From Swiss-Prot:
Transmembrane segments: none annotated. Stable at pH 5.0. Belongs to the bacteriocin class IIA/YGNGV family. Thermostable, retains activity after heating at 60, 80 and 100 degrees Celsius for 1 hour. Long-term storage at 4 degrees Celsius or -20 degrees Celsius does not affect activity. It is found in: Secreted. This is Bacteriocin enterocin-M. Keywords: Antibiotic, Antimicrobial, Bacteriocin, Disulfide bond, Secreted. Its main location: secreted. One of its GO terms (cellular component) is extracellular region. Pfam families: Bacteriocin_II. Bacteriocin that inhibits the growth of closely related Enterococcus species and a wide range of Gram-positive bacterial species. Inhibits the growth of several strains of the Gram-negative bacterium E.coli, but not the growth of Gram-negative Pseudomonas species.
């Protein structure tokens, strides 16, 4: 599960990220994840 700490930081079981700083990185991870899954 993903947890929000209310200040733009989210954590899941493996890592934490700052949404404001990482939106583009998350999009890139999702895209590359889909590409590697093909």
């Amino acid at each position: 599960a993903t947890r929000s700490y209310g200040n733009g930081v989210y954590c899941n079981n493996s890592k934490c990220w700052n949404v404001g700083e990482a939106k583009e990185n998350i999009a890139g991870i999702v895209i590359s994840g889909k590409a590697s899954g093909l």
